[in-house]
Curated annotation (Swiss-Prot):
Glycans are attached at N50. It is found in: Apical cell membrane; Cell membrane; Cell membrane, Sarcolemma. It comes from Rattus norvegicus. It catalyses: D-fructose(out) = D-fructose(in). Residues 39-67, 119-125, 182-191, 298-312, 363-370, 433-438 are extracellular. This is Solute carrier family 2, facilitated glucose transporter member 5.
C-alpha cells in the first residue's frame, strides 16, 4: 500500500500539466519575450523616435538625446522588474499565488495595448512607460510562477516543474527573435505588432487559470482552509486519498507556528534562516553577474568577426536561442536524476571555462585566423552551461529551502538581487568593454569561480526531500536545534515591536 502511495505521488495529471502550462506561458513566456522584443526592431523604433520628435519640434533629435531615450526604453524593463519583485510579498500573501498571477496580467495587457497603439498615437513616451509596466509584470512573474508551481507539484516532480518557468522564458526569447526577423515583424510597419503581441499569453491566462486550483499550501497554512486545501490536492493529484500529503503540509504548518509571517526585515535577523538567505543572494547574484547578458550583448560582434554576414547574424542569434531552449528542455528531464546541486556545479563550471577560453580567443583573434571560430564555440558552450544550471535552478532552489512563512519574503529578496544585478550588468558592461576590451570576461570568470566554490562548500542537495527535511539540513548549518526551535521564537519576540509588526 505504501509503495502504491509513493507511485501515486509522482503522477503528472492533466490538471497539474495544464496549470503549469498556463502559469508559465501566461507569465514566464512574457518575461523572455520582452527581453528580446526590442532588439531586432531597434533601428525602426529609433527612427520613429526621431520622426515623432521632428513632428513636434521641426528639427531632428540630437544623437545624445536619442541614445538617452533608447537607453531608457531598454533599462525601464529591469527597473520595472525590481519594482515588481518588491510587490511579490504583498500580492502572494493577500491574493494567493494564483491570484497574484491573475492580477499581474494588468501589467501585461495594458502595456501591450499601449505599445501596439504607440505609433498611431505618435508617442515614444508610451513605449518607455509600457516597458516599465511589462518589467513590473516580469518582476512579479519571475518570482510567483516558481513559487506557485513548487507548491503545486509533488516532491518528486518539484524539480522538473520548477525548471518549466525558465524553459518558457527561453521559448519567449526565441519566439521574439523569430518574430523579430526582418522578413517577419522587424519592419517599419510591423514593430508595433511585435511589441503588442505580449498581451496574447496574458489574455489566455486571464481566461483559463481561474478554473485551476490555488496552492494547497497557501490555502491550508495561510488561509487555514483545510477543506479547500484538500479539494485542491485531490484535483491536482487525480485521486481522493491525499491524507499523506495533507499530513506533510500540516507538519510544515506546525513547524512554522512559532514564527508566523516573516517579513524581509525579520528574515535578515533570523539565525535559523541565515544560510538559506545567504545562498539565495549568492545564487541570484551569480546568475546575473556571471555574464549571461554580456555574452548575448557581445555575441553579434563575435559572429561578425568570424565572417558571418551582417544580414545573417539575426539567424545565427535565433539559432543560439534555439540551443538555449533545447538545453533548458533537457534540464527539465534531468533535474530529478542529477539533482539541483550537481547541475549548478556543472553549469557554473562550464560558464567559467567558456569565459576563460573566450578571453584568450578574443585576445588572439587578430593573430590566429581560426580564433573567431573558437569564440563562436565558446558562446554556444556558455549558453549551454547557463541553461543547465545558473538560469533555471536558483528560483527553484528558493522554493525548496524556505518554508511557507518565509518564502514570499525570500522571493522578494532574491528577485530584487536578480533584477538589480541584471540592471548593473546592462549599465556598466559597455564601459567595461571599452576599458578592458577582450579581457572583459575575466571578471565574469572570477564570479563564476567564486559562485562554484560557494555551491560546493555550502549548498546541499534538495532532490526528493520535503520542505521540512531541507530546512532541517540547514538547521545544522545555522547551528540551531530544529527548523523553528523554541529559542527562535524567543529571538523573534526579542525583536523591536515595530519590526515584529512589519
Amino acid at each position: 500500500m505504501e509503495k502504491e502511495d509513493q507511485e501515486k505521488t509522482g503522477k503528472l495529471t492533466l490538471v497539474l500539466a495544464l496549470a503549469t502550462f498556463l502559469a508559465a506561458f501566461g507569465s514566464s513566456f512574457q518575461y523572455g519575450y520582452n527581453v528580446a522584443a526590442v532588439n531586432s526592431p531597434s533601428e525602426f523604433m529609433q527612427q520613429f523616435y526621431n520622426d515623432t520628435y521632428y513632428d513636434r519640434n521641426k528639427e531632428n533629435i540630437e544623437s545624445f538625446t536619442l541614445t538617452l531615450l533608447w537607453s531608457l526604453t531598454v533599462s525601464m524593463f529591469p527597473f520595472g522588474g525590481f519594482i515588481g519583485s518588491l510587490m511579490v510579498g504583498f500580492l502572494v500573501n493577500n491574493l494567493g499565488r494564483k491570484g497574484a498571477l491573475l492580477f499581474n496580467n494588468i501589467f501585461s495587457i495594458l502595456p501591450a495595448i499601449l505599445m501596439g497603439c504607440s505609433k498611431i498615437a505618435k508617442s515614444f513616451e508610451i513605449i518607455i512607460a509600457s516597458r516599465l509596466l511589462v518589467g513590473i509584470c516580469a518582476g512579479i512573474s519571475s518570482n510567483v510562477v516558481p513559487m506557485y508551481l513548487g507548491e503545486l507539484a509533488p516532491k518528486n516532480l518539484r524539480g522538473a516543474l520548477g525548471v518549466v518557468p525558465q524553459l518558457f522564458i527561453t521559448v519567449g526569447i526565441l519566439v521574439a527573435q523569430l518574430f523579430g526577423l526582418r522578413s517577419v515583424l522587424a519592419s517599419e510597419e510591423g514593430w508595433p505588432i511585435l511589441l503588442g503581441l505580449t498581451g496574447v499569453p496574458a489574455g489566455l491566462q486571464l481566461l483559463l487559470l481561474p478554473f485551476f486550483p490555488e496552492s494547497p499550501r497557501y490555502l491550508l497554512i495561510q488561509k487555514k482552509n483545510e477543506s479547500a486545501a484538500e479539494k485542491a490536492l485531490q484535483t491536482l493529484r487525480g485521486w481522493k486519498d491525499v491524507d499523506m500529503e495533507m499530513e506533510e503540509i500540516r507538519k510544515e504548518d506546525e513547524a512554522e507556528k512559532a514564527a508566523g509571517f516573516i517579513s524581509v526585515w525579520k528574515l535578515f535577523r533570523m539565525q535559523s534562516l541565515r544560510w538559506q538567505l545567504i545562498s539565495t543572494i549568492v545564487l541570484m547574484a551569480g546568475q546575473q553577474l556571471s555574464g549571461v547578458n554580456a555574452i548575448y550583448y557581445y555575441a553579434d560582434q563575435i559572429y561578425l568577426s568570424a565572417g558571418v554576414k551582417s544580414n545573417d547574424v539575426q539567424y545565427v542569434t535565433a539559432g543560439t536561442g534555439a540551443v538555449n531552449v533545447f538545453m533548458t528542455m533537457v534540464t527539465v528531464f534531468v533535474v530529478e536524476l542529477w539533482g539541483r546541486r550537481n547541475l549548478l556545479l556543472i553549469g557554473f563550471s562550464t560558464c567559467l571555462t567558456a569565459c576563460i577560453v573566450l578571453t584568450v580567443a578574443l585576445a588572439l583573434q587578430n593573430t590566429i585566423s581560426w580564433m573567431p571560430y573558437v569564440s563562436i564555440v565558446c558562446v554556444i558552450v556558455y549558453v549551454i552551461g547557463h541553461a543547465v544550471g545558473p538560469s533555471p535552478i536558483p528560483a527553484l532552489f528558493i522554493t525548496e529551502i524556505f518554508l511557507q512563512s518565509s518564502r514570499p519574503s525570500a522571493y522578494m529578496i532574491g528577485g530584487s538581487v536578480h533584477w538589480l544585478s541584471n540592471f548593473i550588468v546592462g549599465l556598466i558592461f559597455p564601459f567595461i568593454q571599452v576599458g578592458l576590451g577582450p579581457y572583459s570576461f575575466i571578471i565574469f570568470a572570477i564570479i563564476c569561480l567564486l559562485t562554484t566554490i560557494y555551491i560546493f562548500m555550502v549548498v546541499p542537495e534538495t532532490k526528493g526531500r520535503t520542505f521540512v527535511e531541507i530546512n532541517q539540513i540547514f538547521a545544522k548549518k545555522n547551528k540551531v536545534s530544529d527548523v523553528y526551535p523554541e529559542k527562535e521564537e524567543k529571538e523573534l519576540n526579542d525583536l523591536p515591536p515595530a519590526t515584529r509588526e512589519q
